[in-house]
Amino acid sequence: MALKPDIFIVNEVIGADKIQSYRDMGIPVYVVRLSTNIEEVKNEIIKLSVLVGEEQRGKVLVKKMNDKLARIERNIPKELHYSKSTVLVSANYTSYGGKGCMYDDICKHAKIRNGIADLGMNTGQTVNKEVMIEINPDFFFLAKPWKDNKAKDEKLLGEFLADKSLENLRAVKNGNVALLDEKYIFIGHQNCVWSVQKLAHLVYGDCVTLEPEEFLKGF
């Protein structure tokens, strides 16, 4: 409060009580909603840029996102579009990954199939071993913490591959089980374009070159 802000910009995850406490201080509050797809991210950027009087910078940032998404799509041969299926496995969020979440939309932009959504499951429904077996995907992505820990990463991958109930699934037999940083999965800002690049590269290989990742800005 010593800074005497003109407005508070807060994320809805802080909770209604905290948000109301800011409003009770007499300062306008803008609540950023959790984005469930890339289009919502773009819309939020434009709304925020207008709010702070920097609409042109917002437009520049959205253009950067669109240009990078278009580059990724151009590099994936059309005959490969949606030819491979994936399943996201998250030990901490076992009900994440179906229709209506950011991961599902990232898959769409990467031109890969989200096996969980293909099964008709919405995000919020549990992805257990029975679901994995029914889908029998081409790729498994195992969500790992943002902070690298080689021992824990190897343990996570080793335990999954050692599961006898999964050993005959296509992704396991073909060696297509990959660790995926959570920063590519649980993301609600402009760098979600790098998530699209990462997934497309993991599935379709070198036709999608890995551009160096940077935090995208509107200037």
Task: Describe each PLM feature range.
Residues 80-85, 100-102, 109, 134-135:
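Short gly/pro-enriched beta-turn/loop segments at secondary-structure junctions
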Residues 92-93, 119-120, 137, 145-146:
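Histidine- and/or cysteine-centered catalytic micro-motif in compact active-site loops
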Residues 160-178:
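Long, aromatic- and glycine/proline-rich binding clefts that accommodate carbohydrate-like moieties
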